[in-house]
């Protein structure tokens, strides 16, 4: 039955007086935490079944039919909770899912953003099928075995259990947590303290190529005080974190060419140019072994880390040594510089390399072409367009004729070195929100009370998200609230969610929806 959110008392939205605010805030937080926990423990089988049903639908953005099935199911899930939900459509692009709860008397409005699409999969790399949700007693790396989904509340499942499926952590967990927070509030007889606007993106993993147009077309729906970008993992220490920025991103597919046909390496080696060697030398000219980018002008627009940002980084619990140990790394780049500091810098990542064959597929030939795939992570003041120009010019300076077209024999005959560059159509710049703004302090306060201790606060996450669009079009600050476990195999095979992270996420969103409108935003 659809629920109507009508305020019957001002207590849900009125801020307590200054003398009582601290005590009242703690009591409210404890009460909401208990309510969320009570709801969850009484409904675990139903929660996990609903989550599994959502995870069972393939969700690669290019699979339009299944993306639509995801969107339709989300509409059903939202409407069942009293959310006024609809699809925001733009041609044949994956629809964005929108919904809102407008609370009479609420003075603050929050957009909750997440994405319902996931990364493409190579099914053969998964222990169990990526869209056949599987519950395990613990992580695969720790020897976890498959267990049955609970069928009644007496069947207790450990918080260390893992749910394996594509998008279990990235990013359907956040969608589930925020919708279940509505259930927890309703079950406890409470009302949201804020107006809520949900926005679920259907092609974030494809670079959100249509999101800007959707925001512009439906801009009137999105008046708000802040947008919480609900994506990403917890800190590697296992603590809750809040992040106030993202790095930008752009992608490149690069191909260099040798002879028009594969040549016998004995008859033509040391004479015919080897495309694999050409490509690896070109890559070495772009980046050194410590991650420093050698492309001229790449760092010209990069601002130094501010004193406030350095202070935030210094306050982060040290995790680098433990991470190196768990990942089997004797050293990390930049003379073992802290991870949080390295995420403040731009990066060039080699995603893949392909030419010839290895092992049983090796042949004594000189490959006709060699291919590499890159992503570039950008920081504020850098734009994808400028980075593309710098990279193209760098390749030319290495003696290459650069084209984005198909390479012909005439091109090979006319130029000693030929490179085809194919830049991804998506991509976006970095974005940051002040960590000291009133809205930042309000969100930090509520999350602190929810967790019982201060969250880790960082200027940026290492990954990328289209948050600049929200700042550019909607003129709202963006704060990132991740809930997934840091070892969730995000974007990789055997993606998973630790159940305790979902349980904690429900409590966090219950606090935010239930209390954010009643704390001091000054």
List PLM regions with ranges.
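Bacterial N-terminal signal peptides that target proteins for export
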Residues: 1-6
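Acidic/His- and Gly-rich active-site-bordering loop/insert found
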Residues: 21-168, 187-194, 374
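Extended, hydrophobic alpha-helical segments in both membrane/secreted and soluble proteins
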Residues: 196, 214, 228, 443, ...
């Amino acid at each position: 039955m659809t629920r109507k959110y009508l305020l019957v008392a001002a207590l849900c939205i009125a801020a307590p007086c200054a003398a009582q605010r601290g005590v009242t805030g703690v009591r409210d937080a404890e009460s909401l935490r208990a309510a969320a926990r009570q709801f969850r423990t009484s409904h675990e089988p139903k929660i996990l079944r609903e989550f599994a049903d959502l995870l069972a639908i393939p969700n690669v953005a290019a699979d339009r039919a299944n993306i639509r099935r995801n969107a339709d199911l989300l509409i059903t899930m939202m409407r069942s909770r009293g959310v006024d939900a609809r699809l925001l459509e733009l041609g044949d692009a994956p629809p964005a899912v929108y919904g809102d709860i407008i609370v009479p008397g609420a003075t603050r409005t929050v957009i909750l953003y997440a994405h319902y699409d996931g990364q493409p999969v190579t099914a053969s790399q998964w222990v169990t099928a990526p869209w056949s949700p599987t519950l395990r007693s613990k992580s695969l790396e720790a020897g976890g075995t498959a267990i049955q989904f609970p069928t009644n509340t007496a069947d207790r499942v450990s918080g260390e259990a893992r749910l394996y499926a594509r998008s279990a952590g990235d990013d359907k967990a956040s969608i589930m947590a925020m919708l279940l927070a509505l259930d927890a509030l309703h079950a406890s007889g409470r009302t949201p303290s804020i107006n809520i606007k949900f926005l679920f993106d259907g092609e974030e993993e494809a670079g959100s190529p249509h999101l800007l147009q959707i925001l512009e077309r439906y801009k009137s729906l999105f008046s708000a005080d802040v947008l919480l970008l609900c994506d990403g993992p917890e800190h590697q220490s296992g603590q809750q974190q809040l992040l106030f920025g993202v790095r930008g991103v752009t992608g490149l597919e690069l191909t260099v060419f040798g002879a028009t046909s594969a040549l016998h390496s004995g008859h033509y080696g040391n004479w015919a140019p080897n495309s694999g060697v050409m490509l690896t030398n070109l890559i070495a000219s772009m980046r050194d072994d410590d991650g420093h980018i050698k492309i001229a002008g790449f760092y010209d627009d990069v601002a130094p880390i501010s004193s406030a940002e350095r202070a935030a980084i210094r306050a982060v619990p040290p995790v680098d040594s433990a991470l190196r140990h768990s990942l089997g790394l004797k050293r990390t780049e930049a003379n073992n510089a802290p991870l949080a500091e390295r995420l403040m810098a731009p990066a060039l990542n080699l995603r893949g390399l392909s030419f010839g064959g290895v092992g049983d597929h090796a042949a004594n030939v000189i490959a006709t072409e060699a291919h590499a795939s890159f992503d570039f992570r950008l920081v504020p003041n850098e734009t994808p367009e400028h980075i593309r120009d710098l990279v193209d010019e760098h390749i030319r300076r290495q003696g290459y004729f650069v084209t984005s077209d198909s390479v012909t024999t005439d091109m090979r005959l006319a130029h000693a070195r030929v490179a085809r560059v194919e830049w991804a159509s998506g991509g976006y710049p970095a974005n940051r929100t002040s960590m000291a703004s009133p809205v930042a302090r309000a969100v930090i306060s509520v999350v602190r009370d929810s967790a019982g201790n201060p969250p880790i606060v960082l200027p940026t996450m290492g990954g990328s998200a289209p948050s600049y669009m929200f700042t550019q079009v909607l003129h709202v600050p963006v704060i990132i609230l991740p809930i997934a476990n840091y070892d969730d195999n995000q974007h990789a095979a055997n993606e998973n969610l630790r159940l305790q992270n979902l349980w904690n996420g429900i409590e966090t969103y219950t606090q935010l929806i239930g209390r954010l409108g009643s704390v001091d935003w000054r």
